[in-house]
């Protein structure tokens, strides 16, 4: 089993590029699995990240870097992006880095608002979608199920995310503080129909806002509101919707920000949750208009305590080690099976001698049962030790012992070298390249 992943997120690129990469990734996992290029694949696509997890087949024609390059190039072509740009933009992980990264992500430690819980459900839905489409290999299922357990443990054992914070919830809290009236009386206009827009709709309703309109530059507002409620806004009706809105929320990451000149006069709060910006920053200079950006959200969000973050990272590191240890232990199955076959073959040969000399009698049956119990007992300790040594990275010692004592030839399982936890820059410190092409 060789697992890897490709990642593009808000930490390294703008939201518009993430969106284009996500579009380019549509169908890539299914295609790679159907062609036999991958044994399994799961795509995690959210409003601010694209992650493609893959498993190489047992006898792959390319190594991990080669497979990653092929996938990145295919995504680039489908997205209409420069291949070299995509290769340089997407982070690549393999071996023990994969569970460590996924467990960190699912716990909210990689999120723009540390500790947010939306990502946990998104990871769960990514697995369900892959299982439904038939691209989720057993090893990838084990990885994502372990990620879900890790997220639950982080939530139960630390204070991380206990307030149920998210980018959307923090932004709406800020908007509530600076907008006149209460949510039941406010009129909201949402730009976008993606995951962020869906989360925004749910958060607005939780706060009692019922008068919600939705605009989509791609024309998907009608379909979105049919499924989630609200009223669709067309290009023709957009000026009227802007005039009616008390709160305007952008989460589409459109190709070009709306200029300030399109905003009608009057007091309103504008919330821009798109990393690529839905609205020109000059909106903040308009009379009686308050602009809330992602940077505003990061500054305003109550910081998680160092203790909570440290405790969460400890859980993630332990879970990643446990996953790798269990994986390595399972890789010793071939050696265990070889030892059992050898031992049982010796037993069967001796039992044949007993039958030849004494025939099939009640005594012979009792002897066979006793000998098989004895063999199972003798094999117990070597079986346990095989998994222990594998978990300690000493599988080669066990294999050498089998060869020396029994003449059994078994391939040594691949044991990835331990890698140090990756250190990530704060999103605000990381340059975000923009797509070309």
From Swiss-Prot:
<feature type="binding site">
    <location>
        <position position="111"/>
    </location>
    <ligand>
        <name>substrate</name>
    </ligand>
</feature>
<dbReference type="Pfam" id="PF00745">
    <property type="entry name" value="GlutR_dimer"/>
</dbReference>
<feature type="compositionally biased region" description="Basic and acidic residues">
    <location>
        <begin position="426"/>
        <end position="437"/>
    </location>
</feature>
<feature type="binding site">
    <location>
        <position position="122"/>
    </location>
    <ligand>
        <name>substrate</name>
    </ligand>
</feature>
<comment type="subunit">
    <text>Homodimer.</text>
</comment>
<feature type="binding site">
    <location>
        <begin position="46"/>
        <end position="49"/>
    </location>
    <ligand>
        <name>substrate</name>
    </ligand>
</feature>
<dbReference type="InterPro" id="IPR036453">
    <property type="entry name" value="GluRdtase_dimer_dom_sf"/>
</dbReference>
<dbReference type="InterPro" id="IPR018214">
    <property type="entry name" value="GluRdtase_CS"/>
</dbReference>
<dbReference type="InterPro" id="IPR036291">
    <property type="entry name" value="NAD(P)-bd_dom_sf"/>
</dbReference>
<dbReference type="InterPro" id="IPR036343">
    <property type="entry name" value="GluRdtase_N_sf"/>
</dbReference>
<dbReference type="InterPro" id="IPR015896">
    <property type="entry name" value="4pyrrol_synth_GluRdtase_dimer"/>
</dbReference>
<dbReference type="Pfam" id="PF05201">
    <property type="entry name" value="GlutR_N"/>
</dbReference>
<dbReference type="GO" id="GO:0050661">
    <property type="term" value="F:NADP binding"/>
</dbReference>
<feature type="site" description="Important for activity">
    <location>
        <position position="101"/>
    </location>
</feature>
<feature type="active site" description="Nucleophile">
    <location>
        <position position="47"/>
    </location>
</feature>
<comment type="similarity">
    <text>Belongs to the glutamyl-tRNA reductase family.</text>
</comment>
<dbReference type="InterPro" id="IPR006151">
    <property type="entry name" value="Shikm_DH/Glu-tRNA_Rdtase"/>
</dbReference>
<feature type="binding site">
    <location>
        <begin position="116"/>
        <end position="118"/>
    </location>
    <ligand>
        <name>substrate</name>
    </ligand>
</feature>
<dbReference type="InterPro" id="IPR015895">
    <property type="entry name" value="4pyrrol_synth_GluRdtase_N"/>
</dbReference>
<dbReference type="GO" id="GO:0019353">
    <property type="term" value="P:protoporphyrinogen IX biosynthetic process from glutamate"/>
</dbReference>
<feature type="binding site">
    <location>
        <begin position="192"/>
        <end position="197"/>
    </location>
    <ligand>
        <name>NADP(+)</name>
    </ligand>
</feature>
<keyword id="KW-0560">Oxidoreductase</keyword>
<comment type="pathway">
    <text>Porphyrin-containing compound metabolism; protoporphyrin-IX biosynthesis; 5-aminolevulinate from L-glutamyl-tRNA(Glu): step 1/2.</text>
</comment>
<keyword id="KW-0521">NADP</keyword>
<keyword id="KW-0627">Porphyrin biosynthesis</keyword>
<protein>
    <recommendedName>
        <fullName>Glutamyl-tRNA reductase</fullName>
        <ecNumber>1.2.1.70</ecNumber>
    </recommendedName>
</protein>
<dbReference type="GO" id="GO:0008883">
    <property type="term" value="F:glutamyl-tRNA reductase activity"/>
</dbReference>
<comment type="function">
    <text>Catalyzes the NADPH-dependent reduction of glutamyl-tRNA(Glu) to glutamate 1-semialdehyde (GSA).</text>
</comment>
<feature type="region of interest" description="Disordered">
    <location>
        <begin position="413"/>
        <end position="437"/>
    </location>
</feature>
<dbReference type="Pfam" id="PF01488">
    <property type="entry name" value="Shikimate_DH"/>
</dbReference>
<dbReference type="InterPro" id="IPR000343">
    <property type="entry name" value="4pyrrol_synth_GluRdtase"/>
</dbReference>
């Amino acid at each position: 089993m060789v697992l890897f992943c490709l990642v593009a997120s808000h930490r390294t690129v703008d939201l518009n590029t993430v969106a284009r990469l996500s579009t380019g990734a549509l169908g890539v996992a299914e295609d790679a699995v159907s062609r036999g290029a991958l044994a399994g694949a799961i795509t995690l696509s959210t409003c601010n990240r694209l992650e493609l997890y893959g498993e190489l087949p047992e006898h792959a024609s390319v190594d991990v870097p080669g497979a990653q390059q092929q996938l990145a190039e295919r995504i680039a072509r489908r997205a209409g992006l420069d291949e070299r740009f995509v290769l340089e933009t997407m982070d690549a992980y393999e071996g023990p880095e994969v569970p460590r990264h996924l467990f960190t992500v699912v716990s909210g430690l990689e999120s723009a608002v540390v500790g947010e819980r939306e990502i946990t459900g998104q990871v769960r839905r990514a697995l369900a979608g892959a299982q439904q489409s038939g691209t989720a290999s057993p090893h990838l299922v084990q990885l994502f199920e372990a990620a879900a357990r890790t997220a639950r443990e982080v939530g139960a054992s630390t204070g991380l995310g206990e307030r149920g914070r998210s980018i959307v919830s923090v932004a709406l809290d800020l908007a509530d503080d600076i907008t006149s009236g209460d949510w039941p009386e406010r009129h909201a206009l949402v730009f976008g129909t993606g995951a962020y827009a869906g989360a925004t709709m749910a958060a607005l309703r939780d706060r009692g806002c019922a008068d919600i309109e939705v605009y989509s530059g791609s024309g998907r507002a009608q379909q979105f509101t049919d499924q989630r409620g609200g009223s669709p806004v067309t290009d023709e009706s957009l000026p009227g919707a802007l005039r009616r809105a008390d709160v305007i929320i952008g989460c589409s990451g459109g190709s070009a920000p709306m200029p300030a000149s399109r905003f009608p006069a009057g007091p309103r709060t504008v919330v821009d949750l798109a990393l690529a910006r839905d609205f020109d920053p000059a909106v903040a200079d308009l009379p009686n208009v308050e602009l809330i950006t992602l940077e505003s959200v990061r500054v305003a969000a109550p910081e998680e305590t160092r203790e909570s973050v440290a405790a969460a990272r400890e859980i993630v590191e332990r879970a990643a080690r446990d996953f790798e240890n269990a994986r390595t232990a399972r890789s010793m199955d071939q050696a265990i099976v070889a030892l059992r076959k050898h031992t049982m073959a010796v037993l069967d040969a001796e039992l044949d001698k007993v039958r030849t000399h004494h025939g099939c009698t009640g005594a012979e049956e009792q002897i066979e049962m006793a000998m098989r119990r004895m063999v199972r007992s003798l094999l117990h300790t070597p079986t346990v030790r095989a998994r222990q040594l594998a978990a300690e990275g000493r599988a080669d010692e066990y294999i050498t012992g089998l060869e020396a004592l029994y003449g059994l030839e078994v391939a040594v399982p691949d044991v990835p070298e331990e890698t140090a936890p990756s250190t990530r820059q704060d999103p605000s410190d990381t340059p975000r390249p923009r797509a070309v092409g």
